[in-house]
Amino acid sequence: MDETVYQIKAIIVLDNNGKRLCSCFYDPPGTPITPLTEKDKFEKLIFEKCKTSNCELEIIDNKVVIGSKQSDVWIFVVGNSLNSNELALLDVLNTLISLFKKACATDESIMITKKTFLENYALIRLYIDEIVSDGIIFEVDEETILNRVPIADNAAQSLNEAIEMAKEKAKGFGFGFL
């Protein structure tokens, strides 16, 4: 495994209680897939270690972790090893924060909150996928990413409205699980 290529082990977003809002774990080719129980344990370990500090830079479970608290949301970028390039991880974190703020912006605020994060989850996942793929950092230039993810606000709003309308129609047919 070439550690210079596979820099990222995970991107993790947690709420103020340490509950997962989003997590993307990356396992390089030829390595076993990390079991869900280990991912959960690692997320809890990160939160417990960082909840009393800003977690700008930590070594957790032999991995470099860089994180930031934004309102009621914690964002972490986890390096693949102790040899991970902290500056590359910081570039990824700063790009994530900037793009998340754009996605979560409202008329009143540009803060990333749990509510706005979840409302814009699909767009945020697209941003994450443009930045990192399979643990490889592909792009950290914000403008390039914004040009590649051409979802306008009204297009996303129309999609959300269509989903809500479909849920209402499904309820009319007795589908109570929606």
Swiss-Prot record:
Classification via InterPro entries: AP_mu_sigma_su (IPR022775), Coatomer_zeta (IPR039652), Longin-like_dom_sf (IPR011012)
Gene Ontology BP, a term: intra-Golgi vesicle-mediated transport
Sorted UniProt keywords: Cytoplasm, Cytoplasmic vesicle, ER-Golgi transport, Golgi apparatus, Membrane, Protein transport, Transport
Membrane topology: Peripheral membrane protein
Entry's Gene Ontology cellular component terms: COPI vesicle coat; Golgi membrane
TM spans (from-to): none
SUPFAM superfamilies linked: SNARE-like
Cell location: Cytoplasm; Golgi apparatus membrane; Cytoplasmic vesicle, COPI-coated vesicle membrane
Major location category of this protein: cytoplasm
Subunit text: Oligomeric complex that consists of at least the alpha, beta, beta', gamma, delta, epsilon and zeta subunits.
Reported function: The coatomer is a cytosolic protein complex that binds to dilysine motifs and reversibly associates with Golgi non-clathrin-coated vesicles, which further mediate biosynthetic protein transport from the ER, via the Golgi up to the trans Golgi network. Coatomer complex is required for budding from Golgi membranes, and is essential for the retrograde Golgi-to-ER transport of dilysine-tagged proteins. The zeta subunit may be involved in regulating the coat assembly and, hence, the rate of biosynthetic protein transport due to its association-dissociation properties with the coatomer complex.
Family: Belongs to the adaptor complexes small subunit family.
Protein name as it appears in the record: Probable coatomer subunit zeta-B
Naturally occurring in which organism (per UniProt): Dictyostelium discoideum
High-level lineage: Eukaryota, Amoebozoa, Evosea, Eumycetozoa, Dictyostelia
Gene that this sequence comes from: copZb
